[in-house]
């Protein structure tokens, strides 16, 4: 079964964004919508939770 890729509803219609999906083991995969057959970044559930927590906490603010 193929898993569906999702992108932000705020990204508009252009293929110029990050797409994400959650797979069966709970991990999260990301890809570039401009290159759907290109490389995929994969994160374990704990890695993804740490990233989201850091983003919400301002850890990556410039």
Q: Where on the chain are the PLM-derived regions?
A:
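Positively charged, low-complexity terminal tracts
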Residues: 1-62
């Amino acid at each position: 079964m193929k898993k569906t890729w999702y992108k932000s509803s705020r990204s508009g219609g252009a293929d110029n964004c990050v797409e994400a999906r959650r797979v069966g083991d709970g991990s999260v995969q990301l890809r570039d919508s401009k290159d759907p057959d290109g490389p995929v970044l994969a994160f374990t559930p704990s890695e993804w939770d740490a990233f989201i927590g850091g983003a919400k906490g301002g850890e990556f603010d410039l």
